[in-house]
């Protein structure tokens, strides 16, 4: 457990240095538990998520970095690789393709890349996956933009 705490503390210091370098990601460590983190990520440009800010919850296991963190969306998102109700993310690096070389920051970058390039053939949200697999990109974009407006954009007024 000491090794994982040391690694997370190192990542925490790195995140403090990276704040200006990577304005699309804001990682925040829980004040009382270094194994709990949240992230705010900006929706990638030229996607239906553009303009949205999405909150992620990280639960880091004690054997980290030998085991991947559990990550889920707290913000509702219409995406084939994200379970609509639980926010669970289907991403290989969070499962069998994990490597200790990954950091919480690089996991956020991978999630942003997944947002820009969905994998409709391994869906956790079948409705959005079916829209993309059937070629209805317009329908998918419309739904994704609607949920981005409703859940990931600041309310006006």
Curated annotation (Swiss-Prot):
Give the reactions, separated by semicolons, that this protein catalyses.
Answer: S-ubiquitinyl-[E1 ubiquitin-activating enzyme]-L-cysteine + [E2 ubiquitin-conjugating enzyme]-L-cysteine = [E1 ubiquitin-activating enzyme]-L-cysteine + S-ubiquitinyl-[E2 ubiquitin-conjugating enzyme]-L-cysteine
InterPro entries hit by this protein: Ub_conjugating_enzyme, UBQ-conjugat_E2_core, UBQ-conjugating_AS, UBQ-conjugating_enzyme/RWD
Q: How does it sit in the membrane?
A: Peripheral membrane protein
Q: Which UniProt keywords apply?
A: ATP-binding, Membrane, Nucleotide-binding, Peroxisome, Peroxisome biogenesis, Protein transport, Transferase, Transport, Ubl conjugation pathway
Source domain of life is Eukaryota
What does UniProt list as catalytic? 90 (glycyl thioester intermediate)
| GO BP field | fatty acid beta-oxidation; peroxisome organization; protein import into peroxisome matrix; protein ubiquitination
Which pathway does it take part in?
A: Protein modification; protein ubiquitination
Q: Cite the UBC core domain residue spans from the record.
A: 3-153
Enzyme class label: transferase
EC number, as in UniProt: 2.3.2.23
Molecular-function GO terms, alphabetical:
ATP binding; ubiquitin conjugating enzyme activity; ubiquitin-protein transferase activity
What's the stated role of this polypeptide? Required for peroxisome biogenesis. Necessary for the developmental elimination of obsolete peroxisome matrix proteins. May be involved in the ubiquitination of PEX5, targeting it for recycling. Accepts the ubiquitin from the E1 complex and catalyzes its covalent attachment to other proteins.
Tell me its family. Belongs to the ubiquitin-conjugating enzyme family.
Q: What name does this protein carry?
A: Protein PEROXIN-4
Q: Which source organism?
A: Arabidopsis thaliana
Q: Lineage of the native species?
A: Eukaryota, Viridiplantae, Streptophyta, Embryophyta, Tracheophyta
């Amino acid at each position: 457990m000491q090794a994982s705490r040391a690694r997370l503390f190192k990542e925490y210091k790195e995140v403090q240095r990276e704040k200006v370098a990577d304005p699309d990601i804001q990682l925040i460590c829980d004040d009382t538990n270094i194994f709990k983190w949240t992230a705010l990520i900006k929706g990638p440009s030229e996607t239906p998520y553009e303009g949205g800010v999405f909150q992620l919850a990280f639960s880091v296991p004690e054997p980290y970095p030998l085991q991947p963190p559990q990550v889920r969306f707290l913000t509702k998102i219409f995406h084939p690789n994200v379970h609509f109700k639980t926010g669970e993310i289907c991403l290989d690096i969070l499962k069998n393709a994990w490597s200790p070389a990954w950091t919480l920051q690089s996991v956020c970058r991978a999630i942003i890349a997944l947002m820009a390039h969905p994998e409709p053939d391994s869906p956790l949200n079948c409705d959005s996956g079916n829209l993309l697999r059937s070629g209805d990109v317009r329908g998918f974009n419309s739904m994704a933009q609607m949920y981005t407006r409703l859940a990931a954009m600041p309310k006006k007024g």
